[in-house]
């Protein structure tokens, strides 16, 4: 099991790389994360939902995503409330107090049953399981009935490797401090340390490594270098090194708005990778609406709390900036929650995402959305119609809203839909062709669809060519090669 001294220490990446290394050896290996809290998710083959990071790790193993890889997924809708997804299905939304409960006796106390059920099924099907912890095992206030870190490791008698991010500074305090806050049995469970994202001369670090091993009695199993431009599916929130695309000098500007509860920002990885695109995220809580000036394409992403994020967007003045953007010839796209925002009205009569009520939307498209408790989870393929010829497109849907298009569409966005539902349920385009929205996450992953959207938005450069899947494979191979070089694989293999 890989645990970390903090969030974003490198647990997801380390598990993915080790999964690929074991899979290369022809071993049957699978990823496992008992509990994940994230707004980036993926749809499984059987119509369930898991964390995006576990879908990435499954790909590293050569597997399709499965709900057992992430039995508990928490999707925050506010600072204190989250949707609880068990074995791929949304069961309820709970306040934090109800999840943890008084003296640790809330829902969390029984969630371990679902976790162990998935773990035992996987154990029967695979030779090796690589388990990822969550956050830090040393969160004192979360120790009671823990299912994400040491609580799980102790329940299944699993050895633990502790990883820390040296790039943030204070790596020795992170490791020694975490160890000091664990019980004796938990300390004994940690078999070694991995230091992640190191830049510089390893010889200058060596005295610190020698001290760490002498002080703790535990080996340093490797120092992983900082991998520049490693772009793999992010687990959750954007961090600074993920936010902008590569500086290619491109002049075609794409801007994606980021609201407080943005979800599935991995949709935009293909745009960040595109050499002809000047890509950036704009955090609406801190950026000025004037930052949209000069943008060729603006995208509204998904949201876990659409009405609250819409209100934030309006309060910060981005509604007026979007109208100005379109008025002066810019193109506008909404994905999932962003699609709902482009409509006329969003109704939440039962309080699915937040307080029951109704919100006026941005009125760019003739849509009305009603949020419902039942969630749509589907892998979808079809044809996207933006230019003279339709192009193949595939992706996935994750949403609670049912959107109705008012009137007859003069231009359907999707020509073919393989779910048996009307194509208009997937998305629509404005009569003037300047704005479109859809429920399809991953719409940019297919090179032909990405090229079609960029051409529609006015891009006249070269086509992309490489799919996100091909790029992901290249990055996983690069990651695995790096781990093979910089980790003590003999010691690691002895733990399996």
UniProtKB/Swiss-Prot annotation:
Q: Which UniProt keywords apply?
A: Cobalamin biosynthesis, Glutamine amidotransferase
Q: Which InterPro entries match?
A: Class_I_gatase-like, CobQ/CobB/MinD/ParA_Nub-bd_dom, CobQ_GATase1, CobQ_N, CobQ_synth, GATase_3, P-loop_NTPase
Q: Is Secreted a UniProt keyword of this protein?
A: no
Q: Signal sequence: where?
A: none
Taxonomic classification: Bacteria, Pseudomonadati, Pseudomonadota, Gammaproteobacteria, Alteromonadales
Purpose of the protein: Catalyzes amidations at positions B, D, E, and G on adenosylcobyrinic A,C-diamide. NH(2) groups are provided by glutamine, and one molecule of ATP is hydrogenolyzed for each amidation.
Family membership: Belongs to the CobB/CobQ family. CobQ subfamily.
Q: Which PANTHER family match?
A: COBYRIC ACID SYNTHASE, DETHIOBIOTIN SYNTHETASE
Give the CDD domains listed for this entry: CobQ_N (cd05389), GATase1_CobQ (cd01750)
* Official protein name in the record: Cobyric acid synthase
In which pathway is this protein known to take part?
A: Cofactor biosynthesis; adenosylcobalamin biosynthesis
Residues forming the GATase cobBQ-type domain are 251-449
Does the record bear Metal-binding in its keywords? Answer: no
Task: Enumerate the Gene Ontology biological process terms.
Answer: cobalamin biosynthetic process
Active-site residue numbers: 336, 441
Q: Which GO terms describe its molecular function?
A: ABC-type vitamin B12 transporter activity; catalytic activity
Query: What PROSITE patterns has UniProt attached to this entry?
Result: GATASE_COBBQ (PS51274)
């Amino acid at each position: 099991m890989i645990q970390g001294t903090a969030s974003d220490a490198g647990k997801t990446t380390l598990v993915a790389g080790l999964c690929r290394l074991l899979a290369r050896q022809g071993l049957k290996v699978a990823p496992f994360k008992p509990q994940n809290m994230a707004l980036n998710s993926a749809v499984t083959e059987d119509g369930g939902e898991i964390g995006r990071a576990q879908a990435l790790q499954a790909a590293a193993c050569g597997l399709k995503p499965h709900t057992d890889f992430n039995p508990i997924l928490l999707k925050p809708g506010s600072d204190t409330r989250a949707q609880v997804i068990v074995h791929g299905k949304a069961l309820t939304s709970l306040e934090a107090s109800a999840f943890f409960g008084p003296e640790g006796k809330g829902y969390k106390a029984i969630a371990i049953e679902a976790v162990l059920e998935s773990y035992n099924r996987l154990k029967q099907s695979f030779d090796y399981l690589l388990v990822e912890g969550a956050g830090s095992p040393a969160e004192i206030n979360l120790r009671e009935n823990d299912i994400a870190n040491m609580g799980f490791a102790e329940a299944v008698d699993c050895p633990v490797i502790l990883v820390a991010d040296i790039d943030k500074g204070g790596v020795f305090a992170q490791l020694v401090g975490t160890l000091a806050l664990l019980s004796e049995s938990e300390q004994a469970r940690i078999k070694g340390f991995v230091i992640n994202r190191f830049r510089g001369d390893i010889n200058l670090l060596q005295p610190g490594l020698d001290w760490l091993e002498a002080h703790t009695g535990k080996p340093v199993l490797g120092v992983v270098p900082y991998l520049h431009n490693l772009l793999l599916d992010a687990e959750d929130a954007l961090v600074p090194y993920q936010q902008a695309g590569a500086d290619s000098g491109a002049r075609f500007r794409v801007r994606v708005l980021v609201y407080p509860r943005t979800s599935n920002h991995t949709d935009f990885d293909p745009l960040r990778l595109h050499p002809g695109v000047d890509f950036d995220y704009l955090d609406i809580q801190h950026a000025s609406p004037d930052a949209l000036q000069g943008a060729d394409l603006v995208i509204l992403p998904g949201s876990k709390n659409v009405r609250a994020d819409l209100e934030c967007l309006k309060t910060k003045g981005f509604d007026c900036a979007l109208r100005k953007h379109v008025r002066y010839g810019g193109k506008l796209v909404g994905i999932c929650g962003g699609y709902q925002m482009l409509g006329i009205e969003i109704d939440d009569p039962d309080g699915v995402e937040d307080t029951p009520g109704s919100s006026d939307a941005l009125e760019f498209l003739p849509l009305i959305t009603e949020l419902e408790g039942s969630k749509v989870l589907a892998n979808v393929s079809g044809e996207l119609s933006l230019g003279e010829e339709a192009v193949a497109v595939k992706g996935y849907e994750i949403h609670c809203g049912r959107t109705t298009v008012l009137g007859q569409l003069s231009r359907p966005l999707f020509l073919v839909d393989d779910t048996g539902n009307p194509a208009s349920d997937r998305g629509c385009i404005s009569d003037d062709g300047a704005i479109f929205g859809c429920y399809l996450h991953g719409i940019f992953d297919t090179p032909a669809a990405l090229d079609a959207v960029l051409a529609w938005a006015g891009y006249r450069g070269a086509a992309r060519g490489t799919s996100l899947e091909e790029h992901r494979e290249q990055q996983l191979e690069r990651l695995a090669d790096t781990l093979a070089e910089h980790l003590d694989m003999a010691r690691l293999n002895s733990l399996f």
